[in-house]
Amino acid sequence: MGAAGYGALGVAFALVSYLLVTVDLGLDPFAVQRVARDPAGLPSLLPQVVKLRLAASLGAYALLGVLTSILPSQVVGGKELALIYGGRLFSAALKANWALRGRDEMGQVAAGMLLQNLLYAAGIFALVRCPEPSAIRVPILFMAGEAVLVLWYLGRLKAAYPRLWGAPAQNGIAATLLRDSLPVAASKTLRLGFHEGDLLLLAWLSTAAQAGFFLVGHRIVTALASVALLFQQSAFPSLSRLSEDRVGRSLDFQRSVSRGILLCFMPPIVTGAVLGDPLVRLLFGEEFAPAGAILSISLAAVPLLALSAGLHNCLLARGRPRAVLAATGAGTLVHLLLGLAWIPDSGGLGAARALVCGEAVVLVLSSLLVWKRWRVLAVDAATLWILAASGLMAAILWQSEGIWLGWRLLLGLGAYLAAVLFSGALRPHELRRLLEG
């Protein structure tokens, strides 16, 4: 397919992702919170959420049809690709991962995602070995994985609730959730500007090939960020219950979660940032070599995103969705302005720089809002030590260029672990102590 074909797939996917917010409606945090506090009420809640989202998905798909008819092909990435990816609007309405999260069954959520990705990867593996691989088959394979994921989630819930769809509805639940969730839906729409928005800007202000380079460079970033956010999401039900008690305790819990995420994720982030160019050449081939620099820059956004997501969990659990909207909106505005300034000249590199700057603004403002409301620092000394240890690892990897790669990685990782252990930032029993308390 080449960089241009890869970029067309990414642009079509990005367009559908924007419409996906009109189906999601920002309901997940509040639905998760309700299930975490009252698991027995799930059979009454699930049908209302699904019906509301299915109605929204019909309108969103109709809008997608209009957009693919009136917008230039480089903006939509191809009408057929966008319309097939549009099936996500319906699978999103049926996905019940939020119900499993509320029941603290993150293992089932992760297992479903793993199954989906394995099936998708197997399909792509078979596709690239076809004599003439067609781009149109990629969204078809993706939607097959989505269907499996929907059935997996509903099957897990059906096993726990035999009368999942037969419970009497409680009037007003969906309306109450929808009213509370609108700021979250707006925040999610703005948040899409940090990846999907970049792809659309690149397709508009640059070329499909540049969008393809950005998508390849951002593929590893997205994988790491998705797992980090999955850990943050798994903590939200417990955080919701803790938030009914003392505020300080819930904030301590969230800082511990964020610190654990950084502790595990900083070594691969640093390694990818330093070795981005050879890593992209190895995984995607010489044709996508320009994506190496994009990967190196974009990886800096992962720890920023992980920390800000933790702060947003605290704000949402305490009923402050408008604070999340304010921080996300400001970061998105900075990101958009920088993207408009840098993308025409620098392409994917400009988009990557704008992405990191926007994420930094979101984190700073979120930290200030948490401090203003509760007078609690969002980042503690142990977290700063982890970041400092990451800087030491990066310096060793850079300075040891020329020796065998295995020794470079061992030296860098050894220095990182030594610095973390020396600082006392490694606290393996802290999360368990907080949960038991």
Regions from the PLM with identified roles:
Residues 35-49, 213-329:
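Specific pore-lining/lateral-gate transmembrane helices of multi-pass inner-membrane transport
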Residues 18, 66-100, 140, 148, ...:
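Alpha-helical transmembrane segments of multi-pass membrane proteins
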Residues 115-116, 120, 138-158, 170-241, ...:
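Transmembrane helical elements of multi-pass membrane transporters/channels
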Residues 3, 102-103, 130-132, 205-208, ...:
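Helix-loop interface residues and adjacent transmembrane-helix termini in multi-pass membrane transporters
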Residues 1-11, 37-48, 59-90, 130-139, ...:
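Membrane-interface helix-capping segments at transmembrane helix termini in multi-pass transporters
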